[in-house]
């Protein structure tokens, strides 16, 4: 007859226990760490689970074993699962000095668990015990720390009170998702003797906002399980309580960014007393989604009227005002009239100049997809199969040069592109190569008066966006008459 397992609560853990068993909810999970064990001559590994069995009790459980065992745990155990942890060893958590780097989430109790292959194990809890599973899974949405004890994004952006010192630290935030970008694959060289071997990592970038900073901050997610969950987050609907999220300065984005690290905990759509989440969602509903499309979507909202663009600038002046010595940090965009020559307009090349956006959410559709992948959009389309699901629009890179330099970021896009080129995006795709070449030479190496809208780099978009609002062909005499030195 099988021995009946005695399950205990996390609050009952004592450092002297060597066969501790409990039923708990997985609220976070690390990636498996696999290494070569010289003593046994085999590959071993460790997987860390962060578990919780009540609103006040949370700790970590490390699962050690042969690689096959750890890989099986990694595939079987997911965030949100209720599990039985059997035969674990209870370990006292050593004291960590303030500011000391941590490699796992901070526990709310003084002990942690260790499960060794052969003496203990972790399995999914019996599905027939529906009552306990339901109770424990509700903890997934209960805040781990008070929602009132969070910082505002504006405070983080200002350098946590030290704007002259860029520091790396961990903070607690209450934010709402504004945009979820596609997963990117990044190659990283492995350290040591295998330095020529490259590891393929996945990264998901999420833009989060709060009422103090509607421009948004970038949150990078690297852990595969959290990437999978983040892909289900809905813009303006998913609230995140971020615990110990890493804040650091990114040279690539040239601003402070957030990162999900080994010690970070995320509570999705926290359910707590008070109006914090309700007020945050109400604010998010007022923020347009297209604000975070950046350069991926060519059609920019609120295009200025052509007649309103009057300030003449050279290429050098545009760059100086956008990124150089003349920039004003309080101004995020401006307009300019540029007199110059079109020096690149590769309409007949191999690069595609037509993109597509979803008619429902107005977001860019990647070229490898037929329709928008959003569940909400798919549900919308299922109600009416005859309605077009996407709109094509121009997105053409154009180089403009004058006596001071070349503007390489300018783009002829959307409705202005159709007006200037004299045809729709759908019609352009049907042109023969000879016709595309003829269209190109109507502009290339010709002189134009170009009206531009310039959007300066911001934290969630680290590059300059320059959009052609209008352009008119001019004779050489007018170009010379409008030349300036700087």
Curated annotation (Swiss-Prot):
Family matches, as InterPro entries: MEIOB (IPR052469), NA-bd_OB-fold (IPR012340), OB_MEIOB_N (IPR056880)
Record note on disruption phenotype: Reduced meiotic crossover formation and sensitivity to the DNA-damaging agent methyl methanesulfonate (MMS).
Gene Ontology terms: biological process: double-strand break repair; oocyte fate determination; reciprocal meiotic recombination; resolution of meiotic recombination intermediates
Molecular-function annotations in GO: single-stranded DNA 3'-5' DNA exonuclease activity; single-stranded DNA binding
Function text: Single-stranded DNA-binding protein required for meiosis. May be involved in the resolution of recombination intermediates into crossovers in the meiotic recombination pathway.
PANTHER family, alphabetized: CELL DIVISION CONTROL PROTEIN 24 OB DOMAIN-CONTAINING PROTEIN-RELATED
Record text on subunit structure and interactions: Interacts with mei-9 and Ercc1.
Name assigned to this protein: Protein hold'em
């Amino acid at each position: 007859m099988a021995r009946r397992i005695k399950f205990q609560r996390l609050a009952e853990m004592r450092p002297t226990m060597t066969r501790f068993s409990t039923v708990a909810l997985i609220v976070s999970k690390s990636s498996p760490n696999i290494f070569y064990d010289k003593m046994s001559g085999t590959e071993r590994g460790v997987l860390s689970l962060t578990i919780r069995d009540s609103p006040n009790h949370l700790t970590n459980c490390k699962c050690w074993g042969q690689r096959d065992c750890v890989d099986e745990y990694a595939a079987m155990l997911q965030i949100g699962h209720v599990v039985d942890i059997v035969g674990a060893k209870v370990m006292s958590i050593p004291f960590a000095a303030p500011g000391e780097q941590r490699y796992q989430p901070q526990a709310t109790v003084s002990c942690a668990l260790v499960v060794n292959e052969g003496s203990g194990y972790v399995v999914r809890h019996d599905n027939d015990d529906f009552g306990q599973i339901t109770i424990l899974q509700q903890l997934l949405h209960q805040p781990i720390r008070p929602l009132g004890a969070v910082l505002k994004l504006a405070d983080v952006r200002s350098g946590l009170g030290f704007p002259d010192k860029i520091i790396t630290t961990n903070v607690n935030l209450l934010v709402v998702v504004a945009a979820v970008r596609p997963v990117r694959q990044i190659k990283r060289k492995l350290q040591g003797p295998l330095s020529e071997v490259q590891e393929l990592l996945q990264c998901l970038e999420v833009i989060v906002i709060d009422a103090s900073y509607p421009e948004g901050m970038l949150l990078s997610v690297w852990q595969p399980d959290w990437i999978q969950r983040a892909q289900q987050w809905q813009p303006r609907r998913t609230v995140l309580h971020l615990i110990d999220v890493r804040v650091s300065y990114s040279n690539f984005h040239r601003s402070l960014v957030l990162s999900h690290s080994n010690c970070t905990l995320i509570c999705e759509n926290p359910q707590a007393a008070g109006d914090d989440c309700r007020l945050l969602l109400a604010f998010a509903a007022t923020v347009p989604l297209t604000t975070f499309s950046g350069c991926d979507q060519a059609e920019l909202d609120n295009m200025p009227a052509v007649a309103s663009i009057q300030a003449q600038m050279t290429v050098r002046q545009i760059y100086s005002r956008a990124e150089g010595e003349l920039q004003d940090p309080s101004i995020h965009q401006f307009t300019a009239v540029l007199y110059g020559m079109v020096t690149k307009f590769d309409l007949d090349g191999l690069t595609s100049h037509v993109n597509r956006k979803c008619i429902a959410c107005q977001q860019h559709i990647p070229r490898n997809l037929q329709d928008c992948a959003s569940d909400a959009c798919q549900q919308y389309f299922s109600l009416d199969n005859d309605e077009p699901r996407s709109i094509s629009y121009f997105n053409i890179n154009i180089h403009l040069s004058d006596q001071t330099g070349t503007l390489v970021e300018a783009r002829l896009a959307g409705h202005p592109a159709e007006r200037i080129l004299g045809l729709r995006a759908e019609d352009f795709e049907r042109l023969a190569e000879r016709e595309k070449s003829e269209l190109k030479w109507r502009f290339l190496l010709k002189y134009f008066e170009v009206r531009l809208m310039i959007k300066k780099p911001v934290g969630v978009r680290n590059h300059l966006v320059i959009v052609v609002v209008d352009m008119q062909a001019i004779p050489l005499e007018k170009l010379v008459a409008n030349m300036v030195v700087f």
